[in-house]
Regions:
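Proline/glycine-enriched tight loop/beta-turn segments at coil->beta junctions
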Residues: 110-117
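Extracytoplasmic/secreted proteins, especially bacterial periplasmic and envelope-associated proteins
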Residues: 48-51, 55, 73-89, 138, ...
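N-terminal capping segment at the start of a domain
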Residues: 23-70, 85, 125, 293-303
């Protein structure tokens, strides 16, 4: 009996220590109601978000090597949008399973001519035959809005804006993945890298109780059960970047924000364009609505533009813009 009691005591202490440790890696921000919102700016940004999502997920539709012509149409559209905003689009082109595919990127140099590199990107392909409004026209639309906002800004870091190709299967977690190629490119520059931000499915929100799920039960004890927040997710090495971005949301956006630092071996936190940057040793985070852990339209034909919450997407834009404006 004494051994059982000792075992339970040690187990209880260990569990308490784990939760205390993990709580120190959780960066929660209480939503603020005192942040002024420029109605003219919000209207213009929301209009742009809707336009870009509708073009990618509505007019073009499924964008993958399975629907190769649509993938090319999406690439052409994004190159045009880069130019309209005032950036010269560059292509990182390569062969993937018999198809010529391209990352589309633009570099905003620092005001000093040197400084660290920050990569911010979103994948523009969709899964097989699905329209991919949330996954991931939403992320691309927010990226384009950020590019427009920061065009004339004076920043101390070099910002790489990237639309990645081939995030989805059968290319993910392989050299055919666009982010894999770009992470390699950045590592070969031999320059200091501040980190990478992946905008991955950022447009679906649900305030109903029980609408949010998690890959592990223990996370349910620490995070909300309503899918009305944006998550900033990183591995242990990326805790500083997670903290900085979460804090920027607190000062720039009224949107509920949850920062999570988790071990890299958890498969569900490594399912997007940030993962190849982790493998290169860089800090990287995924800003996400958590996709299939909230959105029943994930990887379905129902992932349409009219299922997204553009007001909250605007708040995602505000939070990331707030972070980038500090660089």
């Amino acid at each position: 009996m004494k051994k059982v009691i000792l075992f339970l005591f040690i187990g209880g202490i260990s569990l308490a220590a784990f939760f205390a440790w993990y709580s120190s890696l959780r960066f929660k921000q209480t939503p603020r109601t005192d942040i002024p919102i420029d109605s003219a700016e919000s209207s213009a940004v929301i209009s742009g978000l809707k336009k870009d999502v509708l073009e990618l997920a509505g007019n073009i539709g499924a964008r993958s090597t399975t629907h190769y012509q649509n993938l090319l149409a999406a690439s052409k559209y994004l190159q045009t949008r880069f130019a309209e905003i005032g950036y010269e689009p560059s292509l990182q082109t390569y062969q993937a399973k018999g198809h010529e595919v391209s990352n589309i990127y633009a570099i905003k140099p620092s005001s000093t001519g040197d400084g660290e590199v920050l990569v911010i990107g979103a994948h523009y392909d969709s899964q097989y035959s699905n329209p991919g409004a949330d996954d991931n026209a939403s992320g691309v639309a927010v990226l384009l809005a950020l590019m427009k906002s920061l065009k004339s800004a004076s920043l101390k870091r070099n910002i790489h804006f990237v639309c990645f190709v081939n995030e989805e299967l059968p290319h993910s977690h392989s050299p055919d993945m666009g982010a894999w190629r770009y992470a390699k490119f950045v590592s070969e520059l031999k320059v200091p890298v501040l980190g990478m931000i992946s905008l991955e499915s950022v447009g679906y929100f649900d305030s109903a109780k029980g609408s949010q799920r998690y890959p592990f039960k223990f996370l349910e004890l620490m995070y909300p059960d309503s899918g009305d927040f944006i998550a900033v997710v990183g591995n242990l090495k990326s805790h500083t970047l997670v903290s900085s971005i979460t804090e920027a949301f607190h000062t720039s956006s009224p949107l509920k924000t949850e920062g999570a630092v988790l071990p890299q071996f958890i498969r569900d936190i490594a399912r997007s364009d940030h993962a190849p940057f982790w493998k290169r040793g860089f800090q990287a985070v995924m800003v996400t609505d958590t996709a299939n852990f909230r959105n029943a339209n994930y990887h379905q034909p129902t992932d349409h533009p009219n299922t997204l919450d553009y007001e909250r997407m605007y708040q995602v834009y505000r939070g990331i813009n707030g972070y980038l404006s500090t660089l």
